[in-house]
Amino acid sequence: DGYEYTMECECMEKRRGKWRLQKSGLQDMAERYRFETYEAKTSWQKSILTAAECFCEEREGWFYIGGQAGAGKTHICTAIANRLLLQGKGVRYMIWTEEATKLKALKTDDENYAREIDKWKTAEVLYIDDFLKTRNGALPTDGDINLAFEIINARYNNRALRTIFSGERGLNEIMELDEAMGSRIYQRCGKYKLKIGW
């Protein structure tokens, strides 16, 4: 009939998956931190694993896990991000301390600031690791709180965007720092608000 047709081969979805993984920033951790490698020996670890796997089956919502360092928060959140990547979602990985410093440094450069923060505001899935972490356990600055609120509020206003948080602070402490921000996280997380060791 004079027309040419093309059809994707099966390998294209695998290629897209690899590209999404590279773009997410999780490539180095993706192989080590999966559900299959999470050691769930105790009842609380089993509960966390179950909640994380259930979260991946949901179509919307947020996930928050807080608690002491070394408890497996990054592992379980990376496993969630991995699973969502495999489901075809676009994931971005943010190490709070690094990206917050970069964004605050751009605050006086409106154009660059808007371009950079938009990446975090609009990512289909955003994983924020070490949320509001500071040096030596100090309280976050007003600049940190304002930056976090700007990102969270933009994401809160778009139900299609999913957010995964890990941090050493519990949600109750986040609420004390900024009630508007904490209440948005609390509401969007629903049943996926987990804490370790409090």
Q: Where is each model-derived feature located?
A:
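Pre-Walker A (pre-P-loop) alpha-helix and adjacent loop at the N terminus of AAA/AAA+ ATPase modules
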Residues: T37-F63
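Residue-level preference for the first positions of well-ordered beta-strands
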Residues: E60-Y64, G90-V91, V125, R162-I164
